[in-house]
């Protein structure tokens, strides 16, 4: 407890002494002499220790006392108005002597609930049932206590007034001291409440031995009320805060059963809020979420589509802008200089799985990447990695969420960055400790409880589970980046190991089990999709198919369709309909689903219906619905302060159209995006709508509408595209229907994964681009790759020291590091040929370039090139701005 002089305004700062320990409650009291206010009404009660607290409307409080307090802390008295019917309680001195010095005072909300077989009260009533005004506070007049002083001549008392709707919560908790033999009146100015019809409970504890029910006999209670319009403000504010806080704790997993007391408390809070303020807008939003939106839609003010703007384009940009606002809120309001968002770094790493897809769509890419890098720095600063896995031992899913998910997500925005690639390499190398060939010869997860320091291998921990599979993310990415044979071995081996346990179910159908025991090969948990996380396994099977082209890996994909229909594959990021050759077979069912008019159609059928018909209204329906939901739930996803791994502003549909496939959604680990975007004008990302129907690796179409009043230029980068020479045909669609007019222009360019093309979008027009590969070149992932990046450059007084990494599939030829600025080349230094990192160990060489006075560090950059100008996996990691020393040139400065 801290005391300080009266002050107005200012800031309170709280510093925790234990890591990640939240503040529970803060109480602040203004303690001074004063008078009990008259209020708009008063109700007076007297404590009667000789009277039975037997009114039926006190039964819930009697149950609370019996359930929450040990037998020696259950002394109970009743406070009644003078004329109230009462029943004498029998004397039990032996029981009273065994009690601790705490007494509970019960005050009935009305006198109309006497116990059975008792005289009824006639022609009189007393209480606060259905009272219009609000409770301001309670004055307690304590009788003179004939008890010994225990602390400096006084008797300390603790007084708690319980919340009528949830007696486990205090409306006030205050400690005072009184002198023996001296009566005192204490005015407790509560936070105002519009009381429900529930009865009231106070608990008073004393430090003095002998304090019991008889000591409080004659205590006077005055309930002072104030006008409703004054009291309602604090009531509504407090109840809403309680709803917000309690829902924040329950939002991850909950029932709607009031047998779960945390939910029962939340239900009481939201009910009391809406009882007093039934039109409370945020309260209604919370109740809509709590009740699973079963009571109809909420009103949301939506903008109108401007004249002349295609509806699909307008609503896509509204949808995207809502996500941008949400992400910016989290970065600007929650991310601190340390790098984390305050939700626990392992939960924060789930949050930022939403960042890459948005950045790749062109929205604030540098801000979002910086946010992720800062969180990654916090992760490593906190020591959360050991030997490529989580430092802590934890379950199969949370071991991924300790930062492996974050490292994986960073590659999408830092393609080829050596630090990012080598961190993933370290994790894939560590997989051999947890993914092993079992006695039956199948590659399976050998443990579901592990970390980088210890792997638990007892029988209870040897079950491979569906949630084991998200952690394969680094292997999937490296298998795509440089066709790393170790990564591909793990992906295909896990898929084969699972397929080896396929069986015929009771219906005679092919099926996969839910869990597999590594040691014995036994299975449990029913079929794969009958438990949690079953769909997460599909990305491993899809990756195995894309790495090898072997049809056996599609059996689980078809198994999913047999169970859930083609919409069950909507979690696959790539255009699986064309990859599998199933568009003609499955699109009809999806279009039928999209055309349902009962509002039940999910998003993916609308996407396919647009692809098949060209009707952009299907897209407009998706985006308008998403924009509406994001506006409705914005408060809960931001200022509602849910766990950071529970908030979401979905972008799967935005990514599928703008990127030609989904780059990343949490636990959807095989990248499927065709392209990404970076706009010269940072605001253009939310001004240019883009849709890419039915993309394939060797051809795709881009439909875009620029809603701004000026031309916009964007850099379009290839990802899931075949390398080679491409023909681009670009023109406008005068009818805004996505169909290319006849006066189009054609050009041919080299295009491949991570290569970029500049595209111009004229203002107020629909632009159509048709891209088709006309000549192939060497597969990107099979090439050598040299790179420099984070932490690879040190500037000293007279030199620049550079670490060059070999990151490719093939050995890298010899080359040079060149120092240059706007004037051209300033220095160069050679390095030898480097082997490929086939054993997942970093392969590097050190290069030193002289630093002369002619170098202007602010404009200088480093460039890596090979002697033969050999094509590499990517050129994105071949250039790096030169860091400016933060200290005098005599000291070294690491980037």
Question: Where are the model-predicted features located?
Answer:
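Structural beta-strand segments of beta-rich domains
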Residues: 136-138, 698-700, 712-714, 798-802
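C-terminal beta-strand-rich structural cap/linker in extracellular carbohydrate-active enzymes
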Residues: 745-782
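Short proline/glycine- and polar residue-rich coil/turn motifs
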Residues: 166, 175-183, 748-753, 759-763, ...
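Glycan-recognition and catalytic cores of secretory/periplasmic carbohydrate-active enzymes
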Residues: 56-57, 65-68, 72, 159-161, ...
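Asparagine-centered strand-capping/turn motif at beta-strand->loop junctions
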Residues: 16, 702-708, 804-808
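Surface-exposed beta-strand/loop patches in extracellular or lumenal glycoproteins
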Residues: 705-723
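Extracellular/luminal regions of secreted and cell-surface proteins that mediate adhesion/ECM remodeling
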Residues: 568, 775-895
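Extended, solvent-exposed polar beta/coil surface segments
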Residues: 1-230
């Amino acid at each position: 407890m801290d005391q300080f002089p009266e002050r107005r305004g200012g800031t309170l700062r709280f510093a925790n002494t234990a890591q990640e320990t939240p503040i529970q409650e803060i109480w602040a009291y203004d303690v001074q002499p004063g008078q009990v206010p008259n209020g708009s009404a008063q109700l007076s009660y007297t404590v009667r220790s000789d009277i039975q607290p037997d009114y039926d409307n006190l039964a819930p409080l009697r149950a609370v006392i019996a359930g929450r307090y040990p037998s020696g802390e259950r002394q109970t008295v009743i406070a009644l108005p003078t004329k109230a019917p009462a029943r004498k309680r029998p004397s039990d001195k032996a029981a009273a002597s065994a009690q601790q010095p705490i007494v509970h005072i019960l005050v009935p909300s009305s006198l109309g609930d006497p116990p059975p077989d008792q005289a009824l009260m006639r022609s009189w009533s007393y209480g606060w049932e259905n009272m219009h005004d609000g409770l301001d506070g309670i004055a307690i007049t304590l009788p003179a206590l004939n008890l010994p002083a225990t602390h400096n001549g006084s008797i300390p008392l603790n007084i708690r007034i319980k919340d009528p709707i949830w007696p486990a919560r205090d409306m006030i908790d205050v400690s005072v001291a009184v002198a023996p033999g001296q009566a005192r009146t204490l005015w407790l100015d509560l936070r105002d409440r519009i009381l429900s019809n529930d009865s009231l409970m106070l608990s008073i504890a004393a430090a003095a031995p002998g304090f019991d029910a008889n000591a409080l006999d004659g205590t006077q209670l005055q309930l002072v009320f104030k006008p409703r319009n004054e009291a309602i403000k604090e009531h509504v504010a407090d109840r809403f805060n309680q709803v917000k806080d309690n829902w924040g704790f329950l939002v991850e997993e909950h029932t709607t059963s009031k047998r779960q007391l945390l939910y029962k408390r939340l239900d009481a809070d939201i009910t009391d809020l809406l009882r007093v303020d039934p039109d409370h807008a945020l309260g209604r939003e919370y109740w809509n979420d709590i009740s699973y939106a079963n009571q109809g839609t909420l009103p949301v003010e939506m903008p109108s589509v401007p004249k002349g703007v295609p509806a699909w384009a307008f609503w896509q940009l509204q949808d995207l802008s809502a996500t941008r606002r949400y992400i910016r809120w989290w970065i600007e309001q929650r991310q601190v200089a340390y790098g984390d968002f305050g939700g626990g770094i392992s939960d924060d790493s789930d949050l930022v799985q939403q960042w890459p897809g948005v950045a790749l769509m062109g929205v604030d890419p540098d801000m979002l990447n910086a946010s992720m890098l800062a969180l990654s720095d916090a992760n490593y600063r906190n020591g959360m990695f050991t030997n490529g896995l989580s430092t802590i031992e934890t379950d199969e899913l949370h071991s991924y969420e300790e930062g492996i998910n974050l490292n994986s997500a960073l590659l999408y925005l830092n393609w080829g960055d050596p630090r990012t690639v080598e961190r993933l390499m370290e994790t894939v190398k560590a997989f051999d400790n947890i993914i092993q060939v079992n006695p039956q010869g199948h590659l399976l997860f050998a443990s579901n409880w592990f970390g980088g320091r210890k792997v638990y291998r007892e029988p209870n921990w040897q079950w491979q589970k569906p949630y084991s599979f998200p952690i394969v993310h680094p292997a999937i990415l490296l298998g795509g980046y440089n066709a790393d044979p170790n990564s591909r071995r793990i992906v295909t081996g896990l898929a084969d190991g699972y397929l080896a346990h396929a069986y015929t179910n009771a219906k005679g159908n092919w099926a996969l089990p839910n869990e597999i025991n590594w040691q014995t090969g036994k299975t449990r948990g029913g079929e794969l999709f009958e438990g949690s996380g079953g769909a997460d396994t599909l990305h491993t099977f899809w990756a195995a198919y894309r790495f090898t082209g072997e049809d056996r890996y599609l059996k689980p994909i078809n198994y999913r369709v047999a169970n859930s229909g083609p919409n069950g594959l909507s979690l696959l990021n790539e255009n699986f309909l064309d990859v599998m050759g199933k568009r003609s077979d499955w699109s009809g069912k999806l279009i039928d689903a999209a055309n349902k008019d009962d509002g039940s159609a999910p998003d993916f059928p609308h996407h396919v219906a647009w692809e098949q018909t060209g009707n952009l209204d299907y897209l407009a329906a998706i985006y308008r619905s998403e924009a509406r939901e994001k506006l409705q739930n914005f408060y809960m996803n931001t200022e509602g302060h849910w766990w950071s791994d529970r908030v979401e502003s979905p972008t799967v549909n935005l990514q599928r159209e703008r990127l030609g496939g989904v780059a990343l959604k949490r636990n959807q680990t095989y990248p499927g995006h065709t392209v990404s975007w970076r706009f010269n004008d940072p605001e253009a990302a939310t001004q240019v709508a883009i849709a890419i129907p039915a993309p394939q690796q060797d051809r795709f179409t881009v439909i875009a509408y620029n809603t701004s009043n000026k031309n916009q230029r964007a850099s379009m980068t290839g990802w899931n595209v075949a390398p080679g020479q491409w023909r681009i045909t670009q023109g406008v669609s005068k009818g805004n229907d996505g169909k290319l007019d006849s006066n189009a222009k054609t050009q041919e360019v080299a295009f491949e994964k991570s290569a970029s093309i500049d595209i111009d979008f004229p203002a107020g027009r629909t632009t159509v681009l048709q891209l088709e590969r006309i000549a192939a070149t060497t597969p990107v992932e099979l090439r050598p790759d040299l790179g420099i990046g984070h932490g690879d450059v040190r500037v000293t007084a007279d030199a620049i020291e550079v670490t060059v990494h070999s990151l490719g599939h093939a050995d890298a030829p010899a080359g040079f590091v060149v120092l240059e600025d706007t004037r051209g080349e300033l220095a160069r230094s050679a390095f030898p040929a480097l082997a490929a990192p086939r054993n997942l160990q970093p392969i590097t060489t050190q290069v030193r370039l002289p630093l002369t006075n002619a170098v202007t560090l602010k404009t200088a950059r480093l460039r890596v090139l090979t002697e033969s100008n050999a094509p590499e996996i990517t050129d994105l990691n071949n250039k790096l701005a030169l860091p400016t020393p933060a200290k005098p040139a005599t000291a070294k400065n690491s980037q």
